[in-house]
């Protein structure tokens, strides 16, 4: 009998897949002592004496029989019995030299070595492993399972960290696809009567959905696996901001109308939102897409039944300005006394009313979509207020009435001009006003040519808006440099021209008084009093942060906001959302006005300009005309001026300890 070549495990062989034709290699985890290799067999001698002796004691000679297979080496245990039976049942027939494996045999671990020499099986040896070896094999198997499970959990946790959300990339791609399908299904089930409207609505909604998808993708992709403070986070989030802002610009430019207005609102929040958004969306403050004269003609036919040339003399075909909701044409109007004057004709974009509600629904959907992936972004409630405001702006008759009311409130002010309305040429979608020549308030070069004193102009400008907020409680709520022109009065004083009166907000009397006290206390750096009135206004536990959003001191607004972000960390957006959501809606528009005032203050290089408004807020506290109220006003104003001078003196002597008005910011 030829020498029996056997392969024996040191402590048992676990989970090794048998090879049928050639055994050419073995796993690195099994310790073999290689003594001899021929062209057909792999032979090794195990040094485990206990197992070797056991084999010698239990030899079982098998009859010689021709086989059609190569040597088979395996371990019978509960993990590979079924695998072995499945793989080898039909190989080599049912030769008696193959060790039978009972299906239910899981109580003992056995090893079978089937050895072949020159296509003849010489022996087959079956043995039972010692108990300690068997236990070690089973223990090793269990440890392997535990390690595999632990690795799997670590991989899942790593994937979750990379996604930055409960949603994986696959998840939000699925949501995007389902959103498109849902939108298409709705249009199929309930299509508009006019097929053109179907195409328009479908395309506009797809643009919104696509923009929302891109914005979400940019942030998920560039911030994947990064947390605030990590290396590369600042650089990557700037890239994401820039790309997301471009996606918004593309969307607003394509959909026009309401979307341009939303872009203007976003561009005005420059002390809250990233500068990448502000720079990109500011283009819509002055340059919005306009419609052709043919569209204007159609609107005139619908509104008046006439052609523009039948109503005006020399109606210019190209608009001199285009905004979010309308464009302005210059024309000449012949009055009843045959006087010919220049007028500005504001024409609403055709179809805007029909698109209004659909566009608001689309914006609501995309904000909800973004909120799924960024839970801290909870600003969709703003759309409700925006919807109310925009419905007012779309009514030009309402705008005309607002302008006349504003003129009455400032009837004694010789340095404020409001264009006259020509009612006979005005409808809900066409507004005809006096044309006034002037220079934009942010045009420094133009103001210098006029010889305007910038400090005097700033005090005029801030006082007019302070009176609207603190005294009259009737606020022009769409202020931006394009709506403010400057010209000279006959005596050389600056004359402020206020345009676009479509959106005004009536401020509740109690809100107005509380806001007056809040502003005064912020100017004095009185943290306790300012927090008291901020709570009354609805800021709640975040009352101490409201002053930062008001940014009374432009030179400190960015620094104060950075301090707030450091304190709140990743909760900054959540806190801002809670403050804005719970404040009276009038205050939201006050914040927008404050942004403009801050911009002009910075542009003109005015220091402590907020103090001028503080004096007006004191006047708002004492609005009565009786002698007692007037005495209280002058006494309070005198005390206020003294306090400001004392604080300013201390600030100059000890600048690190006292700041105006950010003295309260160390409480944040």
Swiss-Prot record:
Domain Protein kinase stretches: 314-668
Entry keywords, A to Z: ATP-binding, Coiled coil, Kinase, Nucleotide-binding, Serine/threonine-protein kinase, Transferase
Feature: compositional bias, Basic and acidic residues: 138-162
Composition skew (Polar residues), residue ranges: 91-105
InterPro entries with a match to the protein in the record: ABC1_dom, ADCK1_dom, Kinase-like_dom_sf, Mito_struct-func_regulator
Assigned EC number: 2.7.11.-
Top EC class, one word: transferase
Coiled coil: 131-163
GO terms, molecular function: ATP binding; protein serine/threonine kinase activity
Protein name, as recorded: Probable serine/threonine-protein kinase abkB
Highest taxon listed in the record's lineage: Eukaryota
Region annotation Disordered: where it falls in the sequence: 88-111, 132-162
Record: residues binding ATP: 320-328, 346
SUPFAM superfamilies given in the database record: Protein kinase-like (PK-like)
Entry annotation: catalytic residues: 478 (proton acceptor)
Protein family: Belongs to the protein kinase superfamily. ADCK protein kinase family.
């Amino acid at each position: 009998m030829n020498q029996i070549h056997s392969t024996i495990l040191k402590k048992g062989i676990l989970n090794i897949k048998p090879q049928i034709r050639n055994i050419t290699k073995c796993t690195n985890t099994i310790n073999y002592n290689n003594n001899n290799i021929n062209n057909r067999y792999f032979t090794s001698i195990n040094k485990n004496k206990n197992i070797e002796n056991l084999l010698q004691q239990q030899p079982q000679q098998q009859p010689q029989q021709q086989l059609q297979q190569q040597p088979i080496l395996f371990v019978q245990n509960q993990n590979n019995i079924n695998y072995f039976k499945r793989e080898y049942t039909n190989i080599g027939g049912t030769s008696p030299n193959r060790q039978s494996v009972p299906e239910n045999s899981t109580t003992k671990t056995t090893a079978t070595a089937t050895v072949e020499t020159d296509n003849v099986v010489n022996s087959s040896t079956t043995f039972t492993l010692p108990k300690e070896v068997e236990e070690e094999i089973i223990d090793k198997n269990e440890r392997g399972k535990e390690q595999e499970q632990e690795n799997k959990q670590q991989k899942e946790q790593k994937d979750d960290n990379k996604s930055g959300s409960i949603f994986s990339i696959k998840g939000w791609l699925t949501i995007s696809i389902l959103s498109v399908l849902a939108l298409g299904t709705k249009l199929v089930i309930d299509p508009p009567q006019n097929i053109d409207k179907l195409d328009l609505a479908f395309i506009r909604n797809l643009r919104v959905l696509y923009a929302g998808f891109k914005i979400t993708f940019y942030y998920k992709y560039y911030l994947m696996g990064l947390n605030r403070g990590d290396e590369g986070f600042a650089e990557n989030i700037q890239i994401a901001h820039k790309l997301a802002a471009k996606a918004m610009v593309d969307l607003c430019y394509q959909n026009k109308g309401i979307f341009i207005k939303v872009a203007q609102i976003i561009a005005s929040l420059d002390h809250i939102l990233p500068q990448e958004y502000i720079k990109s969306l500011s283009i819509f403050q002055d340059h919005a897409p306009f419609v052709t004269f043919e569209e204007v003609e159609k609107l005139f036919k619908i509104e008046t039944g006439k052609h523009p040339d039948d109503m005006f003399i020399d109606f210019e075909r190209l608009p001199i300005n285009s905004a979010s909701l309308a464009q302005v044409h210059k024309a000449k109007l012949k009055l009843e006394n045959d006087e010919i004057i220049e007028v500005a004709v504001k024409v609403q974009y055709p179809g805007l009313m029909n698109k209004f509600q659909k566009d608001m629904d689309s914006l609501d959907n995309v904000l909800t979509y973004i909120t799924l992936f960024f839970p801290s972004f909870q600003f969709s409630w703003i759309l409700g207020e925006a919807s109310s405001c925009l419905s007012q702006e779309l009514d030009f008759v309402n705008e005309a009435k607002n302008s006349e009311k504003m003129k009455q409130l400032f009837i004694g002010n010789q340095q404020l001009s409001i264009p006259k309305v020509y009612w006979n040429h005005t409808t809900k979608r066409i507004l005809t006003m006096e044309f006034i020549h002037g220079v934009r308030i942010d045009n420094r070069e133009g103001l210098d040519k006029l010889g305007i004193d910038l400090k005097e102009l700033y005090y005029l400008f801030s006082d007019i808006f302070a009176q609207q907020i603190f005294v009259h409680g009737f606020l022009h709520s769409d202020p931006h440099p394009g709506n403010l022109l400057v010209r000279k009065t006959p005596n050389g004083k600056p004359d402020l021209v206020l345009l676009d009166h479509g959106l005004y907000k009536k401020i509740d009397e109690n809100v107005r008084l509380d806001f007056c006290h809040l502003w005064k206390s912020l100017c004095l750096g009185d943290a306790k009093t300012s927090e008291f009135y901020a709570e009354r206004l609805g800021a709640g536990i975040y009352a101490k942060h409201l002053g930062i959003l008001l940014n009374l001191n432009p030179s400190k607004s960015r620094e104060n906001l950075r301090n707030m972000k450091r304190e709140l960390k990743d909760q900054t957006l959540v806190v801002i959302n809670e403050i804005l959501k719970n404040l009276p809606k009038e205050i939201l528009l006050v914040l927008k006005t404050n942004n403009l005032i801050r911009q002009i203050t910075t542009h003109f290089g005015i220091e402590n300009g907020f103090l001028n408004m503080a004096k007006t807020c004191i006047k708002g506290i004492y609005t009565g005309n009786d002698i007692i109220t007037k005495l209280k006003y002058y006494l309070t104003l005198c005390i206020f001026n003294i306090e400001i001078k004392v604080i300013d003196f201390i600030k100059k002597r000890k600048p690190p300890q006292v700041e105006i008005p950010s003295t309260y910011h160390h409480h944040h």
